[in-house]
Structures are given as structure tokens and as C-alpha cells.
Amino acid sequence: MYPEDSRGSGGVATVDFLEGTYDYAAPTPAPTPLYSHSTPGYYSAPLDAHGPPSDGSLQSLGSGPNSPLVFVPSSPRLSPFMHPPTHHYLETTSTPVYRSSVPSSQQSVSREDQCGTSDDSYSVGESGAGALAAGFEIAKEMRFCAVCSDYASGYHYGVWSCEGCKAFFKRSIQGHNDYMCPATNQCTIDRNRRKSCQACRLRKCYEVGMMKGGMRKDRGRVLRRDKQRTGTSDRDKASKGLEHRTAPPQDRRKHISSSAGGGGGKSSMISMPPDQVLLLLQGAEPPMLCSRQKLNRPYTEVTMMTLLTSMADKELVHMIAWAKKLPGFLQLSLHDQVQLLESSWLEVLMIGLIWRSIHCPGKLIFAQDLILDRSEGDCVEGMAEIFDMLLATASRFRMLKLKPEEFVCLKAIILLNSGAFSFCTGTMEPLHDGAAVQNMLDTITDALIHHINQSGCSAQQQSRRQAQLLLLLSHIRHMSNKGMEHLYSMKCKNKVPLYDLLLEMLDAHRIHRADRPAETWSQADREPPFTSRNSSGGGGGGGGGSSSAGSTSGPRVSHESPTSPGVLQYGGSRSECTHIL
């Protein structure tokens, strides 16, 4: 009835069953771990214990024998024209390469935005290929928190997140928590350090796409809520119909033009609630960049301007991607999009620089690895004055305790308000759809006022704060004009390489400000690509930002024409900015 076992030699046990006899050998050694890190200091674990190292399923991008490979997650959060496909993974000859295929909403801050040259390497042994195929089903079910990379408990507020980050975001949006980063707003948020800085953790939540109303579309309560909203909207339509019948003719015409003639994107922009506008603006914020320039201190005039222009060219690419995420911007014509960007690009970059430097008195944070103080600006003629104005405005931001919601509104207002008075300059064409731009501007201004009204202050204090915030824009415009003139003077002295996108923006600004129409420039007037100063360290790190943005020849130096000092000699079309848009 019961199986009888007999001990054999060599540690082999024989068990007799009714169907036959089975031999069980001694336990075999544990299989070789699938992944082994070649870089010291990383935790190594077998696949069957923790699953694959990626967030989702892995896709094979190559075929060949089992051999070591290099695994680098892709970076879909960045603009596609910023990084060519060869930057997403490193591949050797006849080596199978696997990369992550997780959507951008489930990934944390991209590796391309982190300063460092070390790559995460994983090697696959001979027995790993079979185990990898068997582990695909496990990988499909495993999710990680988009904020801290811990194991996700579910889909919360629009992204996969853990219980800790879900509860933290819920507390943050329900209460009035004025978090302040004790460092430079660059704290690392992971499983072990997510509680060290609440301000950076909340910023990370917004960066990965957490939203107040974000939830899965297949939830039943969403359908019930939609039904309730449908009933409410029907009642609102009925009440609006009565108001429309009794309204004066002028108001009636205004209502018809705003509802029927605005288009789908514009009408949805007008009806968007202020809280949703604020969430969209915060989610559109670009990541913090790295200069990756290996220039020794103290800086000279050439090295300083090389650093700044290289960073400006990189930020311009991200600024265009940021503008395209603004609600209603893509519904504008291409002419209006380019017009707004060309008129406000330096103001947008400057307010971003001031916001990054708000918690570091006396410092200007151009990038994670490029932090300058006032004394370092003395190496460039006229730069110390601009540094002083930037530091003074950052001090004013700090004194007003500017909040992230207010910052994103001011930044969008700068972009949209730049085309309000285009008719004042004879060489600048007016916007094709000025009414749509004004509607966008009104919507963002209403969102700013709505946020200020939620502060709990008196009506007088709320009105005073609105005025204080909007008055900052005139100072930023003044700094932008100073910076534009300084950059133009450096360009005329041939002391700094200017990349194609940056030079295109500078030329457009000079053309719009000219007293007479710009002359037609011929192809022969263009200068050859700048190479000598670039080889000395000028464009090593910045070339990646401009090359994939439509620039094919790298930085250029152009000269002022001796016969026409008011006209630049670099091709005056809008090819660079229009190509990106």
C-alpha cells in the first residue's frame, strides 16, 4: 500500500510504486543565476526569485547565440528628436539585445537626464535564454511604482504606483502642503530615500503623470460618475439656453462665436476646469538637463559662453516639446506656434533658470552639473550685470514663496502673451488666430486666479498677490532684452559657437526688432560649419541636443555684413523651428 524505499550507493534513493520504480538522485547544485551585474555595488538576484529587471515584458531586438549583452532602458520621456535611436541601446555584433517596452507614463526620470557615464550591464549565461522565455509570463504581471520603483500595488491617479506613493500624493492634493526642498530640488527618489524630501517626491509624482482625477477607464464608478455629470450638463445646457434667449444681441453673438467657431480643441480648452489646467501645465514641465561639458575652472570668456550656449540649445529643444503639451497649442496654426516661440524663447528659458535657483541664494542652477555664482560671470564682459538681475529676481521669487502652480502659469503666460502686440513691429506678422491665443491666455490666467483664491487669504491679499506675480513678468522681459543684446554682441565678435536652432531663434528675434524689413539672404552668404573651437571642447556635449533637432552641420559662427550692419548673414528662413514643430 505504501511505497517502500531502499537506499542505494552514491546517495541515490529508489522508491517502488505500483506503476514502476523511480530513482531520485541527490540534489543537484543550484542553477547559475540568469543575470550577473558587471558593475560592482549592485544587487544581484536570480530570475526565478525576483523576475526580470525591467518593468514590463522584454522584446527581442536581435537574434544570435547566447552571449553577454548590454541592457539600457529606452527613454521615451524625452523628445524623439533629442536622441537618435542609437542612443537607446548599445549593441555588439550578433548579440541579442533586449530593451524595455514600458509606456512612458510608467517610467521614472529618464537615464539620459541623469549625470553619469556608467551603464547598467547584465550578462546572460548559457542557461539563461531558456529561463528567460519561461519568465515572460511572470514579467507581464509584475509592475513597479513609477515614482520610487518599488513594487506597484495598483493603478492609482493615472500611473502604476505603490501604496506609499499613492497615499502621499492623496495627502498632498487634499491638503495645503507647502513642501520646501532643503537642497537644490534634485533629490533622488527611490525605495529607500522616498521619505527624505517631500517636495522632490511630489515633483516626481507630477513628472511621471500622476493626476487628481486619473484612474483606469474600465472602472464602473467612472461610468456612474459620467452619468451623473451628463445629467448635470443637461441641466446646465437648459439654464444656458434660457440665458441665451434673454441675453442682449452682443452677448449672444459672442456666445455663438466662442462655441461654434472655435473648433474642437479650442472649445474643450475653454470648458476645461482650472484644476485640470494646472495639472496639465505641471505635467508638461521638461526634465532637468545636464551640460556634460568637461571644461576646467576657472572659466574663460570662450568656455563660459560655450557652456551657456550649449545648454541653451539643449533647452530650446525641450522648450518646444513643452509648448506642444500646453492645452490648445497644437490647435494653433504652424505660423502662430513659431511666432510665439520665436518671440518669447529667452524669457521662457530665464524663468525656468530662476525657478531652479529659487532655493539656492547666490547661485544660478543652469543644469545639474552646471551651477554658477555671480563671481564666475565676471569672466565675460557684461555677464555680471545679467547674473545680478537673475539673482535679484530669484530672491524676489523666494520672498513671495512662489508655488509650482503659480510658476507654471506664469511660464505659459509669457509664451502666449508674447504675440499680443505683434502689430507694433512693422516686420513681424500678426497672429493668424489671435482670438484663439487670447482664449488660451484667459484660461491659464483664470487657473492662476483660481489657485490664488484657494489660499484662504482675504480678497485684498489675493488681489495684491495677483498683481505681484504679474509684475514679475516685466522684469523678466527686461532681462530677456539685455540677454539678447549680449548674446548678439558675442556672436558678432565671433567668440562663441552658436548652434543652428539657437542661431535661428536669435536671428528671428533680431529680424522682428529691426527698423526695416529684412533683406533676402542668399545661400552663398552662409558661413561654413564651426569646427576649430568645437574641437577644443566647445560643442562636445551640446551637439547631441541640436543634431537630432534638425541641425545637420553643428555650431556655426556668422559674421555681420559690413555693408548692412542691421541684417544678419545666416539663412533667415524658419527651417529649424518649423522642422521641429
Swiss-Prot record:
Protein name stated in the entry:
Estrogen receptor
Q: Where is the composition biased (Low complexity)?
A: 100-109
Family statement: Belongs to the nuclear hormone receptor family. NR3 subfamily.
User: What biological function has been recorded for the protein in this entry?
Assistant: The steroid hormones and their receptors are involved in the regulation of eukaryotic gene expression and affect cellular proliferation and differentiation in target tissues.
The yes or no answer to whether the keyword Zinc is present is: yes
Q: Which residues bind DNA?
A: 145-210
Q: Which organism is it from?
A: Pagrus major (Red sea bream)
Gene symbol here is esr1
User: Where are the annotated segments for Disordered?
Assistant: 45-66, 96-122, 216-268, 516-581
Q: What does UniProt say about this protein's domains?
A: Composed of three domains: a modulating N-terminal domain, a DNA-binding domain and a C-terminal ligand-binding domain.
User: Where would I find the NR LBD domain in this sequence?
Assistant: 273-509
Keyword field: DNA-binding, Lipid-binding, Metal-binding, Nucleus, Receptor, Steroid-binding, Transcription, Transcription regulation, Zinc, Zinc-finger
Per the record, where are the segments of Gly residues compositional bias? 536-547
- One MF term in the entry's GO annotations: sequence-specific DNA binding
Q: State the superkingdom.
A: Eukaryota
Any one of the GO CC terms = nucleus
| Cross-referenced Pfam families | Hormone_recep, Oest_recep, zf-C4
State the compartments where it is located. Answer: Nucleus
